[in-house]
Amino acid sequence: MAGCAMNLQFSSVVKVRNEISSFGICNRDFVFRDLAKAMKVPVLRIRGGSGRQRSRLFVVNMSQSPIEPQSGGFAATEQIKGEGDNSILGKDNVRNLGTDQLENLDIDGNVGDGFNGSDGNGGGGGGGNGGEGDGEGEDYEEKEFGPILKFEEVMKETEARGATLPSDMLEAAKNYGIRKVLLLRYLDLQSSAGLLGFAIRSWAMLRNRMLADPSFLFKIGAEIVIDSCCATVAEVQKRGKDFWAEFELYVADLLVGTVVNIALVGMLAPYVRFGQPSASPGFLGRMVFAYNALPSSVFEAERPGCRFSAQQRLATYFYKGIMYGAVGFGCGIVGQGIANLIMTAKRNINKSEENIPVPPLIKSAALWGVFLSVSSNTRYQIINGLERVVEASPFAKKFPPAAMAFTVGVRLANNIYGGMQFVDWARLSGCQ
């Protein structure tokens, strides 16, 4: 307030008054490490021009041993002290703070939001209700993903299987622990016969996506098969009697489409994040840190350690659009370049053949980039959201083939529409 001189003084010792013992203090799972029996807690006093002092103190209940898991509740009490008056402590001035809120206390003793974006479980505003929300969120995560195994438990389970952990998983186990369901899923996948087990052990990108979504490879395979069949049908219908005369264009579209299908599914697939990302100095480091915090797709489900805000989900749509555009342009250069070489060689061999104009290379590649960035990005984001809803349904959890059948059906409809739409875009742009 203007004209009011503020003097902040931090006292080093708190003298606990007898009135505190009459109030119940909520115990939380908070472990005090290497604390002495007496604890010094800072007191914040604010003195205004009116001469009134307003103090905030924090009282720690040390009635239980600090080595016990349930030891020590934490409460915030507020005193209003007038000049020369005794301290007045009212019941309404006591509020419980969870251990997660303890780290987020600001200079006024308030509880801020310590999460990047929205945690979804009591992340905002202070008070006991936020702590209860966190507890409910933790219970749900433990039910859905299993308990967090400590390093000793992780190594015991791993050695029992005769397996070894990758360096990033090993580091995460030492520092944070690993969810039981993720550990068991990895141990099962890495022991798979053939190329799958080798790929899981050697390729972190595939491993992390398979841990988050065991049906990841099924979706890629379904996408490739469906797209190849649908592209053939759509090309025949759209090109009609010119199909065989334009066969090189069909082959180019098919080859590029196969590569693009893998990119489309892979870039939007959820993946497990081990450890905590660290921000590197400089603009590039901040950009990488911000990218790592984004969800894989707009409708990606939140998982332990992954909370996404509405702004992050919106940013994901545009970021994935840029990535899709880059992939489309690159694949267009390669695919259309091969098709143009085939067409040119064919015309040199059979000069009497009715020639069809060779599509412009850069213009065709740009068409692929724009099409993937706008149309494919939007359609596949929606597909991922629909698959998430179906896979999370009780029926699909009891009967997994239902989710797989839905995946085939929705991707079939998407590919039929997308293939016909691309031919229309190509004709309208003059590329084909």
Curated annotation (Swiss-Prot):
Keyword Plastid tagged: yes
Q: Which domain of life is it from?
A: Eukaryota
What changing P295L does, per the record, is: In re-4; pale interveinal phenotype
Residues annotated as transit peptide in the record:
1-47
Knockout or disruption consequences? Pale interveinal phenotype due to marked reduction in the density of mesophyll cells in interveinal regions of leaves. Increased sensitivity to ozone and a virulent strain of the bacterial pathogen Pseudomonas syringae pv. maculicola.
Q: What is the effect of changing G328R?
A: In re-3; pale interveinal phenotype
Q: Which GO terms describe its biological process?
A: chloroplast organization; leaf development; photoperiodism; response to reactive oxygen species
- Gly residues bias (residue ranges): 111-132
Main localization of the protein described in the UniProt heading? plastid
Membrane-protein topology: Multi-pass membrane protein
The subcellular location is: Plastid, Chloroplast membrane
Any one Gene Ontology cellular component term annotated for this protein: endoplasmic reticulum
Q: Which family does it belong to?
A: Belongs to the RETICULATA family.
| Functional note | May play a role in leaf development. Required for leaf mesophyll cell division in the early stages of leaf organogenesis. Acts in a developmental pathway that involves PPT1/CUE1 but does not include ASE2/DOV1.
**What is this protein identified as?**
Protein RETICULATA, chloroplastic
> Where does this protein come from, organism-wise?
Arabidopsis thaliana (Mouse-ear cress)
List the lineage, top down: Eukaryota, Viridiplantae, Streptophyta, Embryophyta, Tracheophyta
